[in-house]
Amino acid sequence: MLGNKNISMAVIRRLPKYHRYLGDLLDRDIQRISSKELSDIIGFTASQIRQDLNNFGGFGQQGYGYNVEALHTEIGKILGLDRPYNAVLVGAGNLGQAIANYAGFRKAGFEIKALFDANPRMIGLKIREFEVLDSDTLEDFIKNNNIDIAVLCIPKNGAQEVINRVVKAGIKGVWNFAPLDLEVPKGVIVENVNLTESLFTLSYLMKEGK
């Protein structure tokens, strides 16, 4: 069920939102919810929610709705959140520091193990409990510390070179904030986060009054 590769990315991208809202419900000690009530909270139709969850077998009961804790746990498993991930962050500028300082990633099981930078002025800087390391040591650190994910917070110039290095060192997942579509071999997953594109979307929606 969890290995189904025919599920659309649109469905996959809705799952984190379900997970987040269900977590909020648990924080409010809400144990049961219907698809209609979930629809009112999230903004998707009840039919869409049922269709999305049915891709993974369905979790509701007729006349009962969803057990919030059970659904939250199962969606977490579908998203791969039932295991921890070790990450390195490349680029210790303002964006990199903001990400390194965000405690929510650790709470979710994503542990940043080290920060790297090529700028001599950044190397040795203390950020949280980390001392920024020279990016020349990046590959050795990845190989010796069971690193799963590389977070790239660097300019697009040089980003492809860095991705080539981390992939060669064994990285299988990249969270890319560089404004560049990176080329990677089969088996390596890249999730691009383009802040400018998101801002442009906001600009459009404001222009249209939506």
UniProtKB/Swiss-Prot annotation:
Protein residues bound to NAD(+): 91-96
| Keyword list, A-Z | Cytoplasm, DNA-binding, NAD, Repressor, Transcription, Transcription regulation
Q: Where in the cell is it found?
A: Cytoplasm
The record's GO molecular-function terms, alphabetically, read: DNA binding; DNA-binding transcription factor activity
SMART domains named in the record: CoA_binding
User: Which residues lie in coiled coils?
Assistant: none
The record's section on SUPFAM superfamilies has: NAD(P)-binding Rossmann-fold domains (SSF51735), Winged helix' DNA-binding domain (SSF46785)
InterPro entries from the xrefs? CoA-bd, NAD(P)-bd_dom_sf, Rex_DNA-bd_C_dom, Tscrpt_rep_Rex, WH-like_DNA-bd_sf, WH_DNA-bd_sf
Gene Ontology cellular component annotations, sorted alphabetically: cytoplasm
Transcription regulation: present as a keyword of the record? yes
- GO biological process entries: negative regulation of DNA-templated transcription; response to redox state
What Pfam families does the annotation carry? CoA_binding, Put_DNA-bind_N
Which residue numbers delimit the DNA-binding region?
17-56
| Role description | Modulates transcription in response to changes in cellular NADH/NAD(+) redox state.
Q: How does it assemble?
A: Homodimer.
Q: Which NCBIfam families match?
A: PRK05472.1-3 (NF003989), PRK05472.1-4 (NF003990), PRK05472.2-2 (NF003993), PRK05472.2-3 (NF003994), PRK05472.2-4 (NF003995), PRK05472.2-5 (NF003996)
The family annotation for this protein states: Belongs to the transcriptional regulatory Rex family.
Question: What is this protein identified as?
Answer: Redox-sensing transcriptional repressor Rex
